A protein has these predicted regions:
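Conserved active-site-proximal phosphate/metal-binding subdomains
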Residues: 1-39, 179-186, 253-278, 285-345
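Glycine-rich active-site/cofactor-binding loop and its immediate structural neighborhood
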Residues: 86-130
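An N-cap/entry alpha-helix motif that binds or orients negatively charged groups
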Residues: 2-86, 182, 191-208, 345
Length: 345
């Protein structure tokens, strides 16, 4: 992310939020409002940050093959995902410690998702809790993501509460058996509020297995998402175990160092899924062209984390709505310049 941070630091005029026209303006506002600890938490990654850089490199090294002289007057950037018609195939990815970026914490992205027309996946280590976030946008569908920090009763309690509060899917993060060293944070002895509140006893996550997933599937009627899939082999296992959504993710480069970039993994996972499970992808997705590349390679939706955090830090839910509007403009333009009017083409 170092290259991106340097590119964000350009001279920009001071304008009102509703007049923002570029991602750089959100970055400038966010960096002004966040302290250095929170900025580094948002844009930092594990150890050498190689996986994080590879996320961006995978996107940047994938080039388009545009077609011309086609009627692209009516471009449709919407999509269906988890039974929902979305204005963009975007899931605001789970971020712990959103309360470090904005006073509304997890409620802000949910409100923005409801106003814009996409989905928010709430992290279990994000205030103010799943009930309060559900109440912030009671008529809009949302997803809950869990870090397994307790036994079967702990898991069941969260699934039941999610169901009782109208969440339409339940995600398990499966790439956090061990907590990585995020050296930007460690060097400053910085601990996020989410980590302080939740505690990080990893024993239960280390033992969490396919048997535990099956137990939840057998007991509850809710679509299951596994977040943190990075190989065809695990994607095959997802299909064999009836997983509804395979979430290709390397935790934004914040867990295993020297992993592959997300987009580099996508094609093999889509092939392994073989249409029997939906596939979503996160990892470095910041621009409309990034989203279009993921959809062209078979994703059903993308997760956006740092994009979301940066916009929220810049100005709360209204800023995130504006950022999503600009993203939609970029997606529509990219599709049109490619000579297509939908992702299916």
């Amino acid at each position: 992310m170092a290259e991106q941070r340097e590119n964000f630091e350009i001279d920009l005029p001071n304008v009102e939020l509703q007049d923002y026209e570029t991602l750089h303006e959100f970055a400038k506002a966010a960096k002004t409002k966040l302290d250095q600890n929170s900025w580094d938490y948002l844009f930092g990654a594990a150890y050498t940050e190689t996986t994080c850089r590879r996320n961006r490199q995978a996107l940047d090294s994938t080039a388009f093959r545009p077609r011309v002289l086609r009627n692209v007057e009516h471009v449709d950037a919407s999509a269906q995902f988890l039974g929902q018609k979305l204005r963009l195939p975007v899931v605001l990815a789970p971020i712990g410690s959103m309360q470090d970026f904005d006073v509304e914490a997890g409620a802000g992205p949910t409100k923005a998702a409801a106003e814009f027309g996409c989905l928010h996946m709430l992290s279990s280590v994000c205030a103010p809790g799943l009930e309060a976030v559900a109440a912030a946008a009671p008529n809009h569908p949302k997803i809950f993501q869990l870090y397994v920090r307790g036994d079967a009763n702990f898991v069941d309690d969260h699934v039941k509460r999610a169901l009782d509060n109208g969440y339409i899917a339940f995600a398990f993060t499966v790439d956090l058996d061990y907590y990585s060293k995020r050296e930007r944070d460690l060097a400053k002895r910085y601990v996020t509020t989410g980590r302080r509140l939740a505690g990080y006893n990893e024993d239960h996550q280390m033992r969490f297995s396919w048997d535990d997933v099956k137990r939840v599937q057998d007991k509850f009627d809710i679509p299951i998402i596994l977040k943190g899939i990075a190989t065809a082999e695990d994607a095959h296992a997802c299909v064999e175990n009836g997983i509804d959504v395979i979430y290709v993710s390397n935790h934004g480069g914040r867990q295993l160092d020297h992993g592959r970039g997300g987009l580099d993994v996508l094609s093999e996972v889509v092939t392994a899924a073989d249409g029997k499970a939906k596939v979503m992808l996160d990892g470095g997705i910041m621009r409309g062209a990034d989203l279009v590349k993921a959809m062209a390679l078979g994703a059903d939706a993308v997760g956006m984390g740092r994009f979301q955090g940066m916009a929220i830090a810049a100005g709360g839910a209204p800023a995130l709505v504006r950022a999503l509007e600009l993203l939609e403009d970029e997606v529509r333009a990219a599709l049109g310049m490619l000579g297509v009017t939908s992702y299916a083409e």
